[in-house]
């Protein structure tokens, strides 16, 4: 079984949400980790775990970031991490997969599916490196992120739909180092 670790220096965990229905706010988590175990070289049997630190959320606006960390949204003090654990990775075509799993945000676990594009594996400076692009959507209210407000015209400030846009680079884990631990 090959073991891989997510390379945070070459990965991005981004999200997008509509603001006032007319514009998009983009954010990211800056601290995260993940592992992948796969027997097959095409990752079709991959088992994936991932978590991100809520306190690392950034939308390039300190006031908004503080609000996102508050009990109105993620409640970082009570729920410091979000996590994902895969249940299946199904090949749908050349280098295209559907990743199913359970996302936990704010203590609430829900099943989600994500679209995955496997960009290949190459020899990097420190061994094998694999690249992936992952996209998907989730409804923030499903995870208890319920805060919203209405504008004067009755529109919502923040949409319920959150789009995920994730770029991941994995490094093959040093098996000898793992055994020594």
Task: Please give the residue ranges for each predicted region.
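Low-complexity, acidic/polar, glycine-enriched regions of mature
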Residues: 1-181
